[in-house]
Amino acid sequence: MSTTTLTRREQRAKAQHFIDTLEGTAFPNSKRIYVTGSQHDIRVPMREIQLSPTLIGGSKDNPQFEENEAVPVYDTSGPYGDPEVAINVQQGLAKLRQPWIDARNDSEELDDRSSAYTRERLADDGLDDLRFTGLLTPKRAKAGKCVTQLHYARKGIITPEMEFIAIRENMGRERIRSEVLRHQHPGMNFGARLPENITPEFVRDEVAAGRAIIPANINHPESEPMIIGRNFLVKVNANIGNSAVTSSIEEEVEKLVWSTRWGADTVMDLSTGRYIHETREWILRNSPVPIGTVPIYQALEKVNGIAEDLTWEAFRDTLLEQAEQGVDYFTIHAGVLLRYVPMTAKRLTGIVSRGGSIMAKWCLSHHKENFLFEHFREICEICAAYDISLSLGDGLRPGSIQDANDEAQFSELHTLGELTKIAWEYDVQVMIEGPGHVPMHMIQRNMTEELESCHEAPFYTLGPLTTDIAPGYDHFTSGIGAAMIGWFGCAMLCYVTPKEHLGLPNKEDVKQGLITYKIAAHAADLAKGHPGAQIRDNAMSKARFEFRWEDQFNLALDPFTARAYHDETLPQESGKVAHFCSMCGPKFCSMKISQEVRDYAAAQAIEVGMADMSENFRAKGGEIYLKREEV
């Protein structure tokens, strides 16, 4: 029975079973490896795909094989991808970064929560059954201290997080010796800096320049360090979160784990339903990747969904609440200014961003400037105290092809550039959010405008969707735009699922969105010429030409679907060693024919060579031994 036919109670029970039985799991024929850094507790996880040997000759009784190197790949699954790690969602993940945070001695534990709302929730006994039991005592910067990775980078300090990232971004490609696998086409990088080897110093320099961010709240020590920047691998974000009509805590934790398994580099919790606070705590304590939020959503819930009733005080309390839970980055729609709202009146689809529409309504109802803009420096002070990165929201992004690249969109973008410089005054890390719905020929301008207006801060886009005619397939329409803008320099792509514009995504939708966007991100890395990006493609092509079916499945982004499609028509074990598939059959397989041509050409070359030598022998008189002067 599919999840779409399950009742709400059945869906929740299924999610609870998933959590209760959760174990570390490796992909088929893969194993978890750890690459160590300069200190013993820097252990960077990667997945190594084991490959079978290639048959190169010999006889049936005595075949000769050539080994194929294992292929290391980037792994976002954290402890969930390691069969040796015991998983207990009730206890949460190990606090990987806690020793590094403590060693810096620039933060301190709080005696009480700073948020009045958090204190109210903790005092409510009726929430005991929902509450995560292993609550952390929150930390914040000591007086006069700054705890951000940008602050350290500007001081010339290479943190353990930066070294971890350098190792991770290299993807273990130094382990590969095969020239066939190492071959790579030169890319077109549009001005990106892509060194052959990423060093901790390079990471530090990129962060110091504001070209990259490391989302790493000191209250989320469970997260594995990662980086977002155009001079690094293109990253993918997955959105999860409940709504007023569907989903539960169990289902959101399940979606979190599922997202990291299928390659989410970060996850945004966009919950708008009941128990937002409790749901987020469960997610953070069990997340190996950075978690982002849109705080205005929860602030709106606190005023019963009435945008006009929002206040700076309620929003500030929400920031403190989420900061002390461990949220790694905030989307803040501070660029939706009162004077920009009329620009959207002539649009076909108006303001489609939830956060943007909330702030636009507030501005119009009070005829005041956006309080997020007015209080932006105070927002930066909060972020600096916990190392929360800012994701400056594109509240005026286009919601249709017709509205792409209009005055409202780019006016807001220019304001985001001004806000970026203010955030940098506080050593707060910044990335910029982008559209939206943009046809292919108008996408590159978005990237060039962002780099110029926002001082090369990382760009983070939703797609963009390249056409509006395909509800149910918007992971395709947006995946096209995502691949293009990733190539042009976008640092992180926010996935779109098949349910976009239609409903809240379920577990399978999350997977489909992530696979689509991992394809887009990887295609962008290839096009940029990112060092090592082609290794997996080369390994796949070699396996395909040699009819190593098991290796083809295991090298795929989704081994299970690849195997299932193959086995629909050739389910027998013999089909997995056959030199053909059901598309062409045994007589018309182009690769089989190519192999035969290659073998024939090699045999012909030997025959021609022997004939040449024979003719040469006869031309020299047919003597077995030549005279010294003839040698």
Curated annotation (Swiss-Prot):
Q: What is this protein called?
A: Phosphomethylpyrimidine synthase
The cross-references to HAMAP family, in alphabetical order and at most eight, read: ThiC
Q: What is the lineage of its organism?
A: Bacteria, Pseudomonadati, Pseudomonadota, Gammaproteobacteria, Enterobacterales
Q: Which InterPro entries match?
A: ThiC, ThiC-associated_dom, ThiC/Bza_core_dom, ThiC/BzaA/B
- Source organism per entry reads Salmonella paratyphi C (strain RKS4594)
Q: What does this protein do?
A: Catalyzes the synthesis of the hydroxymethylpyrimidine phosphate (HMP-P) moiety of thiamine from aminoimidazole ribotide (AIR) in a radical S-adenosyl-L-methionine (SAM)-dependent reaction.
- Alphabetical list of PANTHER family matching this protein: PHOSPHOMETHYLPYRIMIDINE SYNTHASE, CHLOROPLASTIC (PTHR30557:SF1), THIAMINE BIOSYNTHESIS PROTEIN THIC (PTHR30557)
Q: Which residues bind Zn(2+)?
A: H437, H501
Keywords on this record? 4Fe-4S, Iron, Iron-sulfur, Lyase, Metal-binding, S-adenosyl-L-methionine, Thiamine biosynthesis, Zinc
